[in-house]
Regions:
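Carboxylate-rich, polar loop motifs that coordinate divalent cations or form catalytic acidic clusters
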Residues: 1-144
Length: 144
């Protein structure tokens, strides 16, 4: 009897409409016509505050759900992005947004709305930029 009930319930579950189990996903396509700095997006990140970040060939784009804010390199602003070509993005456990560009690696500080480059002393011969940043369980950042 128990086997019969299991088979009956299994068969009935296959016959039930699955529309209640699935949800239609809503996608909106954004281009430079809607405010994105460039139509080619290399990386994307949703941060802990809910912002969407998009790295392009022409700067870093922060999207709040309504409009884009574009961050670009500006030689007259030392706290701007170091380069407009964004390779990858990463948010660490402290909420810092790390940005890997084609020439430097930096992090974004929400408090000052500024970018700060990652610097090394000349003695350790470290590169100025990396392609990826990750964090381990102990909070150590791994630069690759």
């Amino acid at each position: 009897m128990r086997t019969f009930l299991i088979i009956l319930l299994g068969t009935l579950s296959l016959l039930l409409p699955r529309s209640g189990w699935s949800h239609d996903l809503y996608f909106r396509h954004y281009t430079n016509k809607q405010g994105l700095s460039h139509n080619t997006v290399y990386c994307a990140l949703q941060d802990k505050k809910g912002f969407m970040w998009f790295g392009t060939d022409d700067g870093l784009n922060r999207f709040d759900g309504h409009q884009f804010r574009i961050y670009r390199y500006n030689s007259y602003e030392p706290e701007s992005l170091p380069n407009d070509r964004i390779i990858s993005l990463f948010e660490d456990s402290t909420g810092r947004i790390w940005v890997c560009t084609y020439s430097h690696t930096c992090y974004y500080d929400y408090q000052t709305d500024a970018f700060h480059p990652l610097t090394f002393s000349d003695s350790n011969n470290a590169p100025e930029y990396f392609q990826q940043i990750r964090e381990d369980k102990k909070g150590n950042l791994w630069l690759m």
